[in-house]
Curated annotation (Swiss-Prot):
This is Subtilisin-like protease 6. Residues 135-412 form the Peptidase S8 domain. Residues 1-20 form the signal peptide. Induction: Expression is highly up-regulated during infection. It comes from the Eukaryota. The active site is at D167, H198, S358. It holds the Pfam family Inhibitor_I9.
Length: 412
């Protein structure tokens, strides 16, 4: 396992609008969920106008169902609503072509995007230290040179910072978390556990006692993918919304709480305006968000949320400071981090070694938590701090791609 991919076959090609909302076509290598869509409102739409729109939607759907009762299988209609700050309001659900055309003609709607499947794919002065590290990535982040076996770090180790892992869940009972991991919310299935393993591995790199960069951080599981590592894009966005609200105390006192929060999304796929806007809403709330660049060995501008400029997009490096062969690249990449043959935690108390930009992103998320614990300013600007601290180390990073490899500033 590694990066999480999304795929969307074209199903909207036959639909078009004149003087209406954009109906976005899907990419060429994709797997849509039949008749399911995400409807995104214009940025200036108020909460009151959004409520009025969804009321209109319900009334219109009910009227149509009454007119065609017994003639065909009814559509489920709206299933989820999203409100991330004041910049992203949307809903998702099951609608037929006629209803989509009606929705697209509504003045408050910005665009409509097909919902699709998401799945995993493989491919200082007061320093302390950890000798004979279990994962080479730790030693590399704590050292200026490759080849070390010791992780140098400040003992504050991300204490007082919360890390939200938007993934397949976390084995919160794994002994390496030392009781610092807790369950947040499940948007994938009815099993509040990581029955896939991807999320536990990611969380271990962020904040495991032996395997993590920020060894004192608090970890929160946000499950958006099921036991098969599969879920919907609408479910992922719902998890993003919940994490943002929870990080800000349910919407109260956002600034202070958000500044002490980091999030990781080791997932992505074809470029999605809905995903990018939701990610930007998290950044606009003052939260640091690390995301995987993708594993297709292509320009990350074609992936989401990797292509969103406000997040910290992470490509994968190898043990000898090369670009991992699978890693995406390009101007969207902010930094490189270790991502090939990374050992971390596995549900049930054991460990596993995986490769992918999924493994690189949590190194940056963990470093973000570590730096906030040291007193650095949190939020999206933290990515600039990480880039400034990074070393020019990556050989042949790819066309129009940074050669910066993350470093925690230990002085070693």
């Amino acid at each position: 396992m590694g990066f999480i991919t999304k795929a969307i076959p074209i199903v909207l090609a036959a639909l078009s609008t004149v003087n209406g909302a954009r109906i976005l076509e899907a990419g060429p290598h994709a797997e849509t969920i039949p008749n399911k869509y995400i409807v995104v409102m214009k940025k200036d739409v108020s909460e009151e106008a959004f409520s009025a729109h969804t009321t209109w939607l319900s009334q219109t759907l009910n009227s149509r169902l009454m007119r065609r009762a017994g003639s065909s299988k009814p559509m489920a209609g709206m299933q989820d609503k999203y409100s991330l700050g004041n910049v992203f309001r949307a809903y998702s659900g099951e609608f037929d072509e006629a209803m989509i055309k009606d929705i697209s003609g509504h003045d408050d709607v910005d665009f409509i995007e097909p919902d699709f499947v998401v799945r995993t794919t493989t491919n200082g002065t007061n320093l302390t230290h950890q000798d004979n590290v279990p994962s080479w990535g730790l030693a590399r982040v704590g050292s200026k040179q490759a080849g070390g076996t010791t992780y140098y770090y400040d003992p504050s180790a991300g204490k007082g910072v919360r890390a939200y892992i938007i993934d397949t869940g976390i084995d919160t009972d794994h002994k390496d978390f030392g009781g610092r991991a807790k369950w947040g919310k499940n948007f994938a299935d009815d099993m509040d556990q990581d029955c896939n393993g991807h999320g536990t591995h990611v969380a271990g790199t962020v904040g495991g006692t032996q395997y993590g960069l920020a060894k004192s951080v608090s970890l929160i599981a946000v499950k958006v993918l099921d036991c098969e590592g599969s879920g919907s894009n609408s479910g992922v966005i719902k998890g993003m919304e919940w994490a943002m609200r929870d990080a800000s105390g349910g919407g109260n006192g956002t600034a202070k709480a958000a500044g002490k929060t980091v999030m990781n999304m080791s997932l992505g796929g074809p470029r999605s305006e809905a995903t990018n806007q939701a990610a930007k809403a998290i950044s606009d709330a003052g939260i640091f968000l690390a995301v995987a660049a993708g594993n297709e060995n292509m320009d990350a501008q074609h992936s989401s949320p990797a292509s969103e400029p406000s997040v910290c997009t992470v490509a994968a490096s190898t043990k000898d400071d090369g670009k991992a062969s699978f890693s995406n690249y390009g101007s969207a990449v902010d930094v490189y981090a270790p991502g090939k043959d990374i050992t971390s935690l596995k549900p049930g108390g054991s460990t596993d070694t995986l490769s992918g930009t999924s493994m690189a992103s949590p190194h940056v998320c963990g470093l973000g938590a570590y730096l906030i614990g040291l007193g650095k300013q949190g939020g999206p600007g933290l990515c600039d701090t990480i880039k400034e601290m990074a070393n020019d180390a990556i050989q042949s990073p790819g066309e129009d791609t940074t050669s910066k490899l993350i470093y925690n500033g230990s002085g070693k």
